[in-house]
Amino acid sequence: MKKIISFIFLTLTLAMPPAFAMLSMELTRGVSGAIPISIIPFSGSDSSPQNVSTIVSNDLQNSGRFKVSTRESGDNIVKGQVKNVGTDRYEVSFQLLDGLRGKGQEAVALSKSFTISGGELRKVSHRISDMIYQHITGSRGIFSTKIAYVVVQRSPGQSRYVLEVSDQDGYNPRPLLTSSEPIMSPSWAPNGRQIAYVSFEGRKANIIVQDVATGSRQVLSSFPGINGAPSWSPDGRKLALVLSKSGSPNIYVMDIGSRSLKQITNDFYINTEPSWSPDGRTLLFTSNRGGGPQIYQTSVASGSTSRVSYDGAYNARGSFASDGRHVAMIHRTSGNYNIAILDLDAGTTRVLTPSNGDSSSPSIAPNGSMILYDTVYNGRNVLGMVSADGSVQLVLPARAGDAQDPAWSPFLG
């Protein structure tokens, strides 16, 4: 039993929180062959509360898919302007020009205008980035998505835990919950309006669902023992979770409307960290049934289970990419815990993060292009991002405290 408890504690603490203030992205490695794009500084942007063209440039540069310059040249050119049209009202317009089409109106590949308040300038900037990204790459952009994470602020004899939500680039952080007890395992509902998480309020584990906009909360699971690792089904009607109410930790699925439970695993091993497939038919989970932590896949309907990770002695916290073929996971290499991608069809594992430090808590962007995780960087616990092919690496340094246990939102709006 001591071995079981220590494994569960390790599993849970891999997701436990540090502290996170305003973030600034730092691109540590970019992809070769990035698409050149010229983003000309928007006229009027310097006098507005937010510099729209700078935000768009940062978004596209940090995606790793683009090489951004401010010189007007090449096939892809972005121009725009920001006009003050009233008290705290701005008109933002932009054009994406295709240099191959010429220099007149025929060169306009994409254009849009917005009338907004000053407080919406960052939001519109991210929307412009999404539009440009999708037009050029054919894939939906992730710049308007959000991230959730837990912050631990430590002082002598006391820790404070804060569940926060911010833009995907770390700006506009907003606390959802502050507690003197641990908070962990945030999981976004597929509608992007709710977050499920584990809270130890009252010194016991509870799974709570909180409305992101209103802050209203409801306790979904408060059984004796472990209530952990919530994961929303793709249709938003069910929650996979880990319960130990009958002894060993096992995977269950709860119907959120009726609160009825279906037990998925039923044995004396440690079964934890469930994650849904995109079609909602199967669950990935971590189990020590083979001797050490490995990732397994089980049918929600039949309970038929098979092992999917074989490379290495430690693989855990698997989650599907949107294609249903690739799985992000924690993979131990040479004593370090790294973020890796498992190709289920080929059976191959690709390590994505550097091998000189531990990384954990992978969360995949909704378009599958990037993976968010927590790691140690320059002696601090911070959030990092890595592209699904490992060619692009970003760190989001926290200015105060430690940041960990991130969760990427679905597409919003």
PLM feature segments, named:
Residues 24-83:
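Short beta-strand->alpha-helix linker/helix-N-cap micro-motif
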